[in-house]
Regions:
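Glycine-rich, small/hydroxylated-residue low-complexity segments
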Residues: 1-245
């Protein structure tokens, strides 16, 4: 395949954490890069500026909560700016003991299968004993009884002409029984689901231009014609939905 090399500059790592219950490290951590450059064979380089990853985890009353995010100030290709990116997740009311138990069960049963598959080896079968099945059920009941919440607070892509953003919030709850039919089980487990998608019209055209750039197209008029046509098509499909602004 095409060789890929990466050049990292201006790496800064910060951590203020301590071990809480189980295997959870509580506190804040961050990683920042001034630039990350990817070189792929004879193609133009992809350059990401002001890249950061950050997170915080806290525990109170046996419940875990946290914030985790990623930022990319700007991605450029062949010296031309394409877009920046921001993503922020939050989580709260996750029972620490239930999460710890589920992680341990995952390590014992699922991780060996994934490791074998990654090494192109014959993977063992995932089989739970009666005791493990009961443990899984108990852990899930305990987890959902705490009414955990998880949210993609914002995922956004920003170009020079606008922004496309997505947010998603999910509240979970314990169902009356795990033996319910799948549709009813899902309905009872998801207490609330809110999602919002918003796209500035100009971002569609920016995306088309970026794709043309990645594909090596050089005819400016053809690229602009494609961008205009697909922008109008996307606008027409989104009429009345409130997605485009």
């Amino acid at each position: 395949g095409t060789p890929i090399t990466a050049e990292l500059r201006g790496l800064t790592v910060a951590s203020d954490q301590h071990l809480g219950s189980g295997d959870f490290y509580l506190g804040d951590s961050s990683l920042m890069l001034a630039t990350l450059q990817l070189n792929m064979g004879d193609k133009p380089a992809v350059l990401a500026k002001n890249v950061s990853q950050f997170g915080s985890l806290d525990e109170a009353g046996g419940l875990l909560g946290g914030r985790f995010g990623y930022d990319v100030g700007m991605v450029s290709y062949d010296g031309k700016d394409v877009a920046g990116m921001h993503m922020l997740w939050t989580a709260k009311n996750f029972d620490a003991s239930a999460v710890q138990s589920l992680i341990e069960l995952y390590r014992d049963k699922v991780a060996p299968v994934q490791h074998a598959q990654a090494a192109n080896e014959e993977a063992p079968q995932v089989a739970l004993t009666a005791a493990e099945e009961q443990r899984l059920k108990t852990d899930l009941e305990k987890l959902l009884s705490a009414k955990p919440q998880i949210a993609l607070e914002k995922y956004s892509i920003n170009t020079s002409n606008g922004e496309a953003s997505l947010s998603l919030h999910v509240d979970l709850s314990k169902p009356a029984s795990f033996e319910l039919p799948q549709p009813e089980l899902a309905k009872q487990m998801i207490a609330q689901l809110d999602a919002k998608l918003s796209i500035d019209k100009a971002v569609i055209g920016d995306g088309i231009r970026a794709q043309a750039q990645f594909d090596g197209q050089t005819d400016a008029k053809t690229i602009e014609d494609q961008a205009a046509m697909l922008t109008e098509m996307g606008s027409g499909m989104a009429l009345g939905t409130g997605l485009l602004t």
